[in-house]
Every structure is written in structure tokens, then in C-alpha cells.
Amino acid sequence: MKAAEIREKFLKFFESKGHTIVRSSSLVPGNDPTLMFTNSGMVQFKDVFLGTDPRPYSRATTAQRSVRAGGKHNDLENVGYTARHHTFFEMLGNFSFGDYFKHDAIKFAWELLTTVYQLPKDKLWVTVYQEDDEAYDIWAKEVGVPTERIIRIGDNKGARYASDNFWTMGDTGPCGPCTEIFYDHGPDVWGGPPGSPEEDGDRYIEIWNLVFMQFNRDAQGNMTRLPKQSVDTGMGLERLAAVLQHVHSNYEIDLFQNLIKAAARVTEISDLTNNSLKVIADHIRACSFLIVDGVIPGNEGRGYVLRRIVRRAIRHGYKLGRKGAFFHKLVADLVAEMGTAYPELKEAEQRVTDVLRQEEERFFETIEHGMSILEAALAEVEAKGGKVLDGELAFKLHDTYGFPLDLTADVCRERGMTVDEPAFDDAMARQREQARAAGKFKATQGLEYSGAKTTFHGYEEIAFDDAKVVALYVDGSAVNEVKAGQDAVVVLDHTPFYAESGGQVGDQGVLANAATRFAVADTLKVQADVIGHHGTLEQGTLKVGDVLRAEIDAQRRARTQRNHSATHLMHKALREVLGAHVQQKGSLVDADKTRFDFAHNAPMTDDEIRRVEQIVNNEILANAPGIVRVMPYDEAVKGGAMALFGEKYGDEVRVLDLGFSRELCGGTHVHRTGDIGLFKIVVEGGVAAGIRRVEAITGDNAVRYVQELDARVNEAAAALKAQPSELTQRIAQVQEQVKSLEKELGALKSKLASSQGDELAQQAVEVAGVYVLAATLDGADAKTLRETVDKLKDKLKSAAIVLAAVEGGKVSLIAGVTPDASKKVKAGELVNFVAQQVGGKGGGRPDMAQAGGTEPANLPGALAGVKGWVEERL
């Protein structure tokens, strides 16, 4: 049974049991800023389990794409060297949100494994938590698993409820026992059952984990039963496929074998068991799907992790003899394997290919040099009998050649060596400002709140008169009262304040009554439907239960709305001008501008920018109304609404039709396109490989920008004594005049240098048959110095010469040596002798070299020492 069929049977089975098939969420979690990547099926349902994200279904099933390659869950080091470690994997899961519990969860799992997948019952073992008699009895008495194949696992991690069979979401909150299902590969494979000393062997392999969210744990460790008990299960598709296909390594399943063969093809390797092929086959999945979900190789956060994975794959290709880009060629093979299950992969095939190719080309420019340095260093360590690579060198590879530490460690491990990581960390700390560490995600949500959700009125109103204070926070802790001068967070039952979301900044404004005034500086979500007003109490005292008038800064909101609505129009225009591959990859909309990141592989031309501006301004002139509708997500997408990167959507979504644009959006917008006024792009540039950024302004900001631009044009025209319409022609004339004058100046400098050269030749001192000259040439540039040295070499026949010039506090140096003397006196060494004394360095050929310096005061002494330096070598 192929992996694709296994996935399909899983989803269809649970659909037949009343579960809703929910699409895989993005690898970039939309609801947990503390998590680098989605690493399990339950991540997208976290808020559902917590009760803050209601869904129209109580049973769900998913095939969730997942990555474990950064932060706490990091399998990168083991990938390619073990049978079951991957950076990317698919987690099959079924979920119950206060619906069925242990009985049905266990029965469903057993039926699927033994009836649908037809696994032999006598090959299946199960574990339960030591105290979970209920699960034990279901397995033994209802399912009929022999008691000798049911193993109780206690607290085996050093604390109460710290067990392989007890799951927790954190130190507090939902938790409960779990039961795991294992497959026995038989006595021919070494290993013992779970809980035994030999459990780490490969005979008994965990294939499914059923978690029962049964309790809530408080800060004191007390357990109370949850009013709604839930189920979260997870089964790795790759592990299950290995069992069903009767192989002992995930890399032997059909999906991986096809990718390994493709990797062998592009690397021209015939041995399909080579571990490097496994690494490459694994990494193309992680890299491709991360790019699909909007992650781009970079130097921090998720982009840094992606870059590490890409470069690790490239390094393994390099190890196999590939000296040029190859990795991106596997995208088509991956699409053939997984494009049907994940249409978004097929749609993004060209973009993924382009991003990977660009990253490869960039890395191959430096990998050979970096690898040669690393190999030489390792050889030196081995020659001395050592086993540890210097951490300073590892940092140099990281900082100069783009080698992540784990890549260097990977190479070391293959040689039986390690890296001095403390020394690496010390070097990193000294350069912390330039090399910011990856993976430090700051949570913007963290206030404990268990009350009712906030009712938002901001789509229709800019003020609400009877808003009641339901919670107050100071320094992250809940309080009952806030005093004047204190910074605080206020939660209201009703508010017109928009909380930062979807790229749009939160509102500012005032909360007030007759005795109290609270200035709101920002508005952020405390939970999905709970809005926090961040600011300072300027007057009076504020208590839970107080009633206030909540009023936003209407002018700021209006400017923000103009920019947000313009963003929708610009997105559509970009797709018309540049192509349908353009997708939003990030945005920031505030009162001053809109900043929009999108997928595109080349800088926009001036003509393309003008066309986008023209399209948007035409839509503004049409003054089309904005129409908002709420509908099911699937219906909205089928109707042509565009879903945006990084956003988390519920099953009911808000669709905005604005002019020719239709997008899913929960933000605030203008009533008609004409309200935007004027649209102008002011910045276009690149932020990462395959990602461009534009910044644009609207309304009064755009008018002011055009007026200032017009004023500068008039000033420039006046300075050149021309009309504004003649400015381009006049600038061209001035440039021609400058070019002509520079040519004349160059000729004069050459003439001056020639005459000075004749005088300098007379200053040369003969040393052992070689004329030595070290002098300063006033007013010369590097070109003039070089020409003068050449003339002096011709004139003196046998010579070692250093000429210097000083301009703007900087020293320029040129050294020249005739062929007969260059065997003993090298121009590069000679120029460095002088350069080191004037605060610089340089290099070049044995007969000609150049350098610079920043300490001209030391130049006379440095030149005076040239004769003695040459004399020592002759």
C-alpha cells in the first residue's frame, strides 16, 4: 500500500465516523508565536482545546505537514543517519473536542489498523499510563488485546505525572494520560517491548499515540477533571507506511525511494544506500514546503533554519561530487509525489524552484573555499592527535562563509570529531549585534484571562459609550485597580478599538468617564476574541467594573484604513502586472504607509511600478463601494477570494470586495475606493531571495509627497538655470561637461606625474645592483601612481619602487619590482611592509601590488625604512 493510499484511507475512515476533514495548516503557526514551526497535528487546534476558538464541528481529522528542525523540537542532526528521523513529516490525526473520549478513540484506532490496514492483531502492543485503569480495561476487556501485550508505564521522568504516557500542554492547563500503539517487527530484529531495558531497539516501533485530555492542572499541581474531555491523536505517515510496506526504515518506503532515486539522478550517484541521498531526499521536502508556506532563506528566525537545511543538503551533494546547483531540480520530483495531496505545492512549483536555485548559487560561490579551510583545519587537528575543532575557526566559517555550526559539526562528526561549542558561543557573543541568534520568538499574548470574549464594534463605530472594564493588568499580572501614572492593559466587554491583526496596526485613542482618562497607545489581542487596550492612566483611578466611553483616534484610523484598502488594490494590480505567482508574504499597514512583501524573483522596473500605480489609481477614480460578506471559508475561496500568507482563518470568514479585488480580511477599510484619494509607491526593493517589498502612501501623505517632489524639481531646475521641463536635458549636458573636464584633469595629472617621475628617478639609491625608490607623489590617484611606477621601472631597468599619495586622510600605496629582482623582493611583501606601518594592508603580484592605510602621519618613517628592508633581501 503506497503512502498516498495510506493517507487517503486514514482521512476517509474518520470521515465515515463523523469527522470533518480539515486541511493541513501552514508550517508557520498562526496561533502560537512561541512555536517556530507546526510540529504536530494539534497545533492548529490549540485554541479549540482551550475553548477560545469555537468550531462548527466537534470531530476533526487531518493529515498535517510538520517540521522539526528548530527550537525545542530539532531532529536535524539525526536526519539521514537513523531510520526514522526527518525534518519534514506528515502527522495523521483524529480529534475530539468534548465529543467522544477513550472508548471510541481506542475502538476507532483498533478498527482502522486491523480492519482497514489489515495489520495482524498479534503484532500490536499497547502502553497505558500506570493509573489509567479505564484505558487498560478498554484494551483488555473490549478490544481483546492479551494482557501480556498491554504495558503500564509509570512516572519514568523523575516527577509526579512526568511519564512517557502522560501528556501536558505546559506546567499548567489541560493534560492527561495517553496510550501508545506499537508494532512488533519480530524476533529477527533486536529490541525489547516498551518499558524494558532494550526498548530503544528497532523491534517494537511506536506508530500511534492517543492523548486523552482529561484533567486541568493548576499552579499547585492539583488535578481536576475537565468539564469537556477531549482526544488528540497522532500517527506518523512515514512510520505507518514502513510497517505496511514491510520495511524497517522510513527511507525504504515508496515515497522516499522515489525521492532518493531522483537525488541519485541529479547527483549522478549509483549507490542508493548512500546516507547523503537520504539527507537530500528528506531535506527537499522540508525546504519546499517551508517555502510554500512563505518562509524564505535568511539570517534569523525561521528563514535561518530553512537556510541551514538547504545548505546541509547542498553540503551532502558537494560531498558526493556536485560542484554546482542541483538541489532545486528535485522540486519537480517532489511535486510528482505529493502535489496531488497538497495542491499548494504544485501551484508554487516554479517559485520554490527559483528560491532554491538562487540560494544554491549563492552558497556555491563560497562553499569550496569554506570546505577547503575546514578540511585543512581538521587534517591539522588529526595530525596532532586531537579530536576537537577550534570554536573560533567554526565561528569564522559561520560568519565569513555562511556555514551554520551544525553543518560544521556534521562534517566533524563524520571524522569522529567535535566542535568546541563554548568557544564558538564566545565568538558569537562578541559579535552579537551583527549575528542575531535565530529562534527567539517573543510572545505578544501571555495574559491569563478566562472571562467572556470582547464584542467588537469597530467596523461600524468609532466610539462606544457604555464599555465595561472586565479585566486589568499591570506588569503582566491581573489587578483590580490601576492608579494614575501606571501603564496597564484594559479589557472591555465592548470596544470599537481594532486589535493588531492581519498586518494592520492596533488603534489608539481614549477610554474615559467624568473622573478617569486612560490613553490607549496600542491595541492587541489577549486571546483570539479578547482585546487588550495598552496604555497609561493619565487621570483618576480605574477599577474592574467601571464603565467608560471608548473612543478611537478617528483621524489615525481613517489614514490606516486608506492604506489597508490600497494594499488590497495593489496586491491585485501586482498580480496583473507581474503575474499570478505574486503572493503576499507579509505586510504592515499603519497610518503613515503600507509595506507589502510579495513573492517575485526580480526587481520591478520603473515601467512596472508606473503600471501598478496607474491601475490602483484608476480603481480609486472609479469610486467603487466596499462590500463585506461573511461566509464559509471553502465557499469564499471557491468564489475567488484570496487567502493571505500567515493568517489563521476560521471556518466562517469575512470577505471584502473592493473594486476589482476580493480578499479574506478581518481589517477595517474605506467605504468606497475613492476615499483612498491618491496612491503612490515610494520604495521598491528586495528583502530576501525571491521576496520583494514595496512601500506606498495614500491620501494626504501622497499629496504631500508629490508636492515635495515637485518643489525639489523646481529647485533643481533653478539651480541649473533651466525650466522644469528642460531638467533632464540640462542634467545630461552638465554630465557631459563633467566627463570632459575629468578627462582634461586626468591628462594634466599624467603629465604632472611624468615630470615628477623624471625627478624621482634621480632620487633612486642603488643597492646590490637594484635601484630602490620610496617617495610621495603629490596629488596623484591610484591610476597615476601605477602609471608612474611602470615608467620608473622602464627607466631604471632594475628596481624596487614604492610610491605613495595622501588624500582625505587616507594613504594610497603602489609597489613595483622589475622581473630580475622579484625573485628575492616581492612587490606584495614590500607594499605590506609599508602598509602595516600606516594602518592598512594590501597585496598583489610579485611585480606589482597595491595597498591603503589610514595613518598618514606614519608615512615618512615607513618610506624611510624601505631601503633597509630591500637591502636585507638582496
Curated annotation (Swiss-Prot):
EC number(s) stated in the UniProt entry for this protein: 6.1.1.7
Domain remarks: Consists of three domains; the N-terminal catalytic domain, the editing domain and the C-terminal C-Ala domain. The editing domain removes incorrectly charged amino acids, while the C-Ala domain, along with tRNA(Ala), serves as a bridge to cooperatively bring together the editing and aminoacylation centers thus stimulating deacylation of misacylated tRNAs.
Gene Ontology cellular component annotations, sorted alphabetically: cytosol
PROSITE patterns per the UniProt record, alphabetical: AA_TRNA_LIGASE_II_ALA
Keywords: Aminoacyl-tRNA synthetase, ATP-binding, Cytoplasm, Ligase, Metal-binding, Nucleotide-binding, Protein biosynthesis, RNA-binding, tRNA-binding, Zinc
A GO biological-process term: negative regulation of DNA-templated transcription
Reaction equation(s) it catalyzes: tRNA(Ala) + L-alanine + ATP = L-alanyl-tRNA(Ala) + AMP + diphosphate
PANTHER family (UniProt xref): ALANINE--TRNA LIGASE, CYTOPLASMIC, ALANYL-TRNA SYNTHETASE
NCBIfam families from the UniProt entry: alaS (TIGR00344)
Protein name per its UniProtKB record: Alanine--tRNA ligase
Cofactor dependence: Zn(2+)
Localisation: Cytoplasm
Keyword field contains Mitochondrion: no
Nuclease is among the record's keywords: no
Organism name: Burkholderia cenocepacia (strain HI2424)
The record's free-text note on cofactor binding: Binds 1 zinc ion per subunit.
Function: Catalyzes the attachment of alanine to tRNA(Ala) in a two-step reaction: alanine is first activated by ATP to form Ala-AMP and then transferred to the acceptor end of tRNA(Ala). Also edits incorrectly charged Ser-tRNA(Ala) and Gly-tRNA(Ala) via its editing domain.
Family membership noted in the UniProt record: Belongs to the class-II aminoacyl-tRNA synthetase family.
One Pfam family named in its UniProt record: tRNA_SAD
Domain of life the protein comes from: Bacteria
InterPro entries: aa-tRNA-synth_II/BPL/LPL, Ala-tRNA-lgiase_IIc, Ala-tRNA-ligase_IIc_anticod-bd, Ala-tRNA-synth_IIc_core, Ala-tRNA-synth_IIc_N, Ala-tRNA_ligase, Ala_tRNA_ligase_euk/bac, DHHA1_dom
